[in-house]
Curated annotation (Swiss-Prot):
The active site is at E306. GO terms for molecular function: nicotinate-nucleotide-dimethylbenzimidazole phosphoribosyltransferase activity. Its EC number is 2.4.2.21. NCBIfam families: cobT_DBIPRT, PRK00105.1. Signal peptide: none annotated. This is Nicotinate-nucleotide--dimethylbenzimidazole phosphoribosyltransferase. Keywords: Cobalamin biosynthesis, Glycosyltransferase, Transferase. Belongs to the CobT family. PANTHER family: NICOTINATE-NUCLEOTIDE--DIMETHYLBENZIMIDAZOLE PHOSPHORIBOSYLTRANSFERASE. Catalyzes the synthesis of alpha-ribazole-5'-phosphate from nicotinate mononucleotide (NAMN) and 5,6-dimethylbenzimidazole (DMB).
């Protein structure tokens, strides 16, 4: 813990002093790219992806051998405001479904040969109702970020971040409103199917929460503490840990992007090692990506969460790395290069 003894101080210091890009590795990849048996630039974003991998792994021939999907699950006190068609018990039930191999993310991980870890975060103890109190105290929030940092402990070279938590699109909308302004209508969407009166209550909850905590919302970590959730704090911690260990990150949908947005608001360079796997059909997600200047890899109309969009994007990243490392050069293949 820092000398001041405040739990967030260590994270503030970490966010200020993150390791930077390896420009030498990036340059080496770009130099090799022009020698490969294809017209320059013809693989489009795949060429940018492999340069990104090199930049943040420090490897001049980047490979993806141990991709991991980390799914964080949390419950939220704000669900007491009747904002969602599903009860909070569904969060734990879905964690059991993940363990049994019965969820969409399980099938995508099988299809793409990805590892999967699921972290349930005190599901029996929901965070505080953000319309009435802070979601967490500073110690709990910092401890949960630290827990999220352990997601990479088993080893990975590409981390896909996802989540599960009934009510957490409400939380993500509140975070986005606090960080980037606008109105609740700009950020609130249907989530798991909130329409009609449910949607009106969801909008009201976001407005009330941001108004209640307004005095604390100038500090992004305080936004996380007051308005966030355990799974969002853990995802923020995992993103930071990955940066320290030179592990590129693929971020999933709206809720996972809200975790990244907290770090972005604290230091825009803090998520340079992150790629955003897809843009969700949840309306606020496209706006959130635009605020952070990020272009998603996929747009499939998905809005499930669970890391599904990130996991699908991981296969594209794997393919980009294999194209770069496995393709022959013009000289090796005896193919004439362009004049």
């Amino acid at each position: 813990m820092s000398a001041s003894g405040l739990p967030f101080d260590d994270f503030r210091e970490l966010i200020r002093n993150l390791p930077g890009p390896d420009l030498g590795a990036e340059r080496a990849v770009r130099e090799r790219e022009v020698t490969l048996t294809k017209p320059a630039g013809s693989l489009g974003r795949l060429e940018e992806i492999v340069a990104w991998l090199a930049t943040w792994t420090g490897k001049r021939t980047p490979q993806v051998n141990r991709p991991l999907v980390a799914v964080f699950a949390g419950n939220h006190g704000v669900t007491a405001k009747n904002i969602t068609p599903f009860p909070p018990s569904v969060t734990a039930q879905m964690v059991e479904n993940f363990a049994a191999g019965g969820a969409a993310i399980n099938q995508i991980c099988i299809a793409n040969d990805l590892g999967l870890k699921v972290f349930d975060l005190a599901l029996e103890h929901p965070t505080g109702d953000i319309t009435e109190e802070a979601a967490m105290d500073e110690r709990t929030c910092a401890a949960t970020m630290a827990f999220g940092m352990e997601a990479i402990a088993g080893g990975t070279d590409l981390l896909c971040i996802g989540e599960m938590g009934i009510g957490n699109t409400t939380i993500a909308a509140a975070i986005a409103l606090a960080l980037f302004g606008g109105t609740a209508e700009d950020w609130v969407g249907p989530g798991t199917g909130s329409t009609g009166e449910l949607m009106q209550r969801k909008l009201a909850a976001v407005r009330q929460a941001v108004a209640l905590h307004q005095p604390h919302l100038q500090d992004p970590l305080e936004v996380l503490r007051c308005l966030g959730g355990r799974e969002i704090a853990a995802m923020a911690g995992a993103i930071l840990a990955a940066r320290m260990e030179k592990i590129p990150v693929i971020v999933d949908g709206f809720v996972a992007s809200a975790a990244a947005a907290v770090l972005y608001a604290a230091n825009p360079e803090a998520i340079d090692h992150c790629m955003f796997g897809h843009v969700s059909a949840e309306p606020g997600h496209r706006k959130l990506l635009a605020k952070m200047g990020k272009e998603p890899l996929l747009d499939l109309g998905m809005r499930l969460g669970e890391g599904t969009g990130a996991a699908l994007a991981a296969n594209i990243v794997k393919a980009a790395a294999l194209c770069h490392s496995g393709m022959a050069t013009f000289e090796q293949a005896g193919v004439s290069a362009s004049k």
